[in-house]
């Protein structure tokens, strides 16, 4: 039986070569699927996108509206909200009933516990290992090695609070921010 070959430009792919190619493709696909989560874990998350920040969310997941927020909180309060990367961030109410231009990340720099505000002692006190931070989040007692991270807090024209990455000098330590 005579077989008529197609174009001489088309390479002949034998059964063995086809099976090798199919096996290689299958193994590569499975390996890539297995490695994807590991590689994604090693790449740090973005800090809220390039849009200039994220809108702070209250405990119920609603956008923080500044006038309503100030009506229900007193001067000196530090109130948890969802901030950059979804981290808990304290919104600071100043003495003149305005919101401070900074937010304080509530994640302890020792082992990552959420640090509650202790109003009676006017400081943040970590329940895990006893680290303490002053009212601005500067570490005053270890074992935490660093102060709490800061975020810019800005009120938008539509009365929402936007938190963005703090990249300037840390006003508490006069050093470059360790978190940027």
From Swiss-Prot:
Span of domain Rieske: 66-162
Named cofactor requirement(s): [2Fe-2S] cluster
Transmembrane segments: 21-43
A Pfam family it matches: Rieske
Keywords tagged on the record: 2Fe-2S, Disulfide bond, Electron transport, Iron, Iron-sulfur, Membrane, Metal-binding, Thylakoid, Translocase, Transmembrane, Transmembrane helix, Transport
UniProt main location, coarse: membrane
One cellular-component annotation, GO: plasma membrane-derived thylakoid membrane
InterPro entries, alphabetized: cNMP-bd_dom, Cyt_b6_f_Rieske, Rieske_2Fe-2S, Rieske_2Fe-2S_sf, Rieske_Fe-S_prot, Rieske_Fe-S_prot_C
Catalytic activity: 2 oxidized [plastocyanin] + a plastoquinol + 2 H(+)(in) = 2 reduced [plastocyanin] + a plastoquinone + 4 H(+)(out)
Transport among keywords: yes
Record's bilayer topology term: Single-pass membrane protein
EC number assigned by the record: 7.1.1.6
Similarity remark: Belongs to the Rieske iron-sulfur protein family.
Role summary: Component of the cytochrome b6-f complex, which mediates electron transfer between photosystem II (PSII) and photosystem I (PSI), cyclic electron flow around PSI, and state transitions.
NCBIfam families xref list: Cytb6fFeSPetC, PRK13474.1
Other facts noted in the record for this chain: The Rieske iron-sulfur protein is a high potential 2Fe-2S protein.
Subunit-level organization: The 4 large subunits of the cytochrome b6-f complex are cytochrome b6, subunit IV (17 kDa polypeptide, PetD), cytochrome f and the Rieske protein, while the 4 small subunits are PetG, PetL, PetM and PetN. The complex functions as a dimer.
Protein name from the UniProt record: Cytochrome b6-f complex iron-sulfur subunit 2
Gene this chain is encoded by: petC2
